[in-house]
Amino acid sequence: DQIAYIYDSPVTDTIQKITFKELQENVSKFAGGLQSLGLKKGDTAIIYMPMIPQAAYAMLACARLGITHSVVFGGFAPHELAIRIEDCNPKVIITASAGVEVKKRIPYLPFVKEAYEMSAHKPENIVVFDRQLWGNKVDWENEPQLTNFQELLEKSESVDCVPVASTHPLYILYTSGTTGKPKGVIRDTGGYATA
C-alpha cells in the first residue's frame, strides 16, 4: 500500500495516488497488451504523451519487455515527431488524445496522425489513451486502426520481465538539434539502472 508516486495536475484539478502494487499491476498488464500487439525484445516504441500516469506505465512496460522506447516531448510539432519516427523506426506509437496546459489544449492525436502521414516509416500500431477532454475525444468507431490504451491494459494478462543484457538499449533520447538534425543518444539498461 506504499505510494509509488503522486500525480498532481493543477490544470485538470486531479490528484491521484498510485501505490507500488497498482503501478506493478498496470505496468505488467500494459506490457502484456504490447506483447499481444506483437511487440517483443529488440523492437522500438515512441511515447508521445503528456505527463500523466499512463506515460510512466508505457515507459516501464517497454523496459519490462526489452522494447527500446523514445519519449518525445509533447510540445513538438508533427514535423519534429516525424523526424524521430523515421530515425528510430518504432513498431508502435503510444500517445494520448490530448494534453492541457494552463490556457490551451494540445491535440496530441491529431499531431501523431499528421506526423504518421509525413513519415516514410509507418508504425504498425498507434495506441491512444483517450483523456476525454473537451473537443478531443477519440472516435473509435470511425478509426479502427487505433488501439484503445485503457482497453488494452484492462483485457491483457500480466507478463513477467524479459531478461536483457546490461548493454541492451533501454531508451533513445534525442539531442536538441541546434547544429543540425537531432541525434538519438542510446542509453543502455545497465548503465541507467546503476546511475
Q: Which residues are covered by each model-predicted region?
A:
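N-lobe entry segment of adenylate-forming
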Residues: D1-I18, E25, K29, Y116, ...
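Conserved pre-ATP/AMP-binding loop-to-beta segment of ANL
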Residues: I3, I126-F129, W140-Y174, K181, ...
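Conserved AMP-binding/adenylate-forming core of the ANL superfamily
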Residues: A4-M59, Q145-E151, G190
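Solvent-exposed alpha-helix faces
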Residues: S28-G32, E86, G180
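Conserved S/T- and glycine-rich ATP-binding loop of Class I adenylate-forming
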Residues: A45, C62, P169, T175-T178
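Short acidic loop-to-helix transition motifs that present clustered carboxylates
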Residues: Q54-A55, G75-E80, A193
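Structural core segment of the AMP-binding/adenylate-forming
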Residues: R64-E151
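Short, intrinsically disordered, charge-balanced linker/junction segments flanking boundaries
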Residues: D188-A195
